[in-house]
Amino acid sequence: MSKETLILLYGGRSAEREVSVLSAESVMRAVNYSRFVVKTYFITKGGEFIKTQEFTDKPAEEEKLLTNDLAESYPKISPAAIYEKAAVVFPVLHGPMGEDGSIQGFLEILRLAYVGPNILSASSTMDKLLAKHVFEAVGVPQVPYVAAFADENQGEIAQEVVEKLEFPVFVKPANMGSSVGISKVDDLADLQPALSEAYKYDNRVVIEQGVDAREIECAVLGNNSDVSATLPGEVVKDVEFYDYNSKYIDNKIQMDIPAKVPADLAQKMQEYAIKAYKAVNGTGLSRCDFFVTKDGNVYLNEINAIPGFTQWSMYPLLWENMGLSYSDLIEKLVDLAKETFETRENHLL
């Protein structure tokens, strides 16, 4: 039997391209090579596509995915040249141009099956403001927040924050993930510098009420009505808040899987995770991040439609705890991608 082709897209234009490379390398090593041939394409910061490598067997430990200057020495190709009949694409891309619906729309134009969120679920979960409106509509609790826009009167924004929230607050670009551009603000004097930092990444910003809470996450997997969520896991931090460096560079986090929470609280988070996932028409996978306060209140922080996917990332570790190995998880995601593709093709008039 001939092998299936799995195409890995990695790199990308966003500030999170380094995370993408780490995730793609983990997938490259964990793939079931008795079923798949893996072809890899690097997307440069400028958005150009480069075919880098092809693997028919598990690569040696010292073999790495080509990136940056080395990858850019290879010839650039037309983005549409990645097309291969019956191939499945795994877009291991994070942030803008990766999990905001852009690459998903491109792959649908090419009529390729792909792992992960569809256009709607990617774009709606990537936009923190839009996601908040959706979650409010289905009754999933969230912390209080204020929306800010770069072209608005910043003094009026500050006044609204003072009236509606209490310090500390967290300032977040509306369209960015992996804690890029996020600042913790302890008093009014530090609000404007934090807004200026966030506006570097997006002209729309969310200012959220800080809460004294544990950060607990559930992994979600499935399509349509057949969706399941894991027992929650907890981020245990050695830093004040979970920023980009602590996540991916400084290794200052640990994870408790499963999280030490009462069974009824774990069930509540699983129910909220599935409700939020279905509300945004989730496909494939997502990670739902919650705040849990000392008095047992649960708040959905965000849905991450393409969560970090290294072998030490929370998402695959949560499923491993449920008995689904990293390699089997990849195969399940490919099967879900093919299912979504077939459904989409059958619905075209």
UniProtKB/Swiss-Prot annotation:
At which positions is Mg(2+) 1 bound? D289, E302
GO cellular component terms listed in the entry, alphabetical order: cytosol
Which residue range or ranges hold the ATP-grasp domain? 132-335
Amino-acid positions noted as binding Mg(2+) 2 in the UniProt annotation, renumbered to this chain = E302, N304
Q: Where in the cell is it found?
A: Cytoplasm
Q: Does the keyword Repeat apply?
A: no
Which coarse location class describes where this protein primarily resides?
cytoplasm
Q: Where does ATP bind?
A: 162-217
Q: In which pathway does this enzyme or protein participate?
A: Cell wall biogenesis; peptidoglycan biosynthesis
**Per its UniProt record, what InterPro entries does this chain match?**
ATP-grasp (IPR011761), ATP_grasp_subdomain_1 (IPR013815), D-Ala_lig_Van_CS (IPR000291), D_ala_D_ala (IPR005905), Dala_Dala_lig_C (IPR011095), Dala_Dala_lig_N (IPR011127), PreATP-grasp_dom_sf (IPR016185)
- GO-annotated biological processes: cell wall organization; peptidoglycan biosynthetic process; regulation of cell shape
Q: What is its EC number?
A: 6.3.2.4
Catalysed reaction(s)?
2 D-alanine + ATP = D-alanyl-D-alanine + ADP + phosphate + H(+)
| GO MF, one annotated term | metal ion binding
Query: Superkingdom of this entry's organism?
Result: Bacteria
**What keywords sit in the KW lines?**
ATP-binding, Cell shape, Cell wall biogenesis/degradation, Cytoplasm, Ligase, Magnesium, Manganese, Metal-binding, Nucleotide-binding, Peptidoglycan synthesis
- List cofactor names only: Mg(2+); Mn(2+)
Coiled-coil regions listed: none
Q: How is the cofactor bound?
A: Binds 2 magnesium or manganese ions per subunit.
The record's annotation in Pfam families points to:
Dala_Dala_lig_C, Dala_Dala_lig_N
Q: Which PANTHER family match?
A: D-ALANINE--D-ALANINE LIGASE, D-ALANINE--D-ALANINE LIGASE A
Its biological purpose is as follows: Cell wall formation.
Give the family per the record: Belongs to the D-alanine--D-alanine ligase family.
What name has this protein been given in UniProt?
Answer: D-alanine--D-alanine ligase
Tell me the organism: Lactococcus lactis subsp. lactis (strain IL1403)
- Which gene is this protein's source? ddl
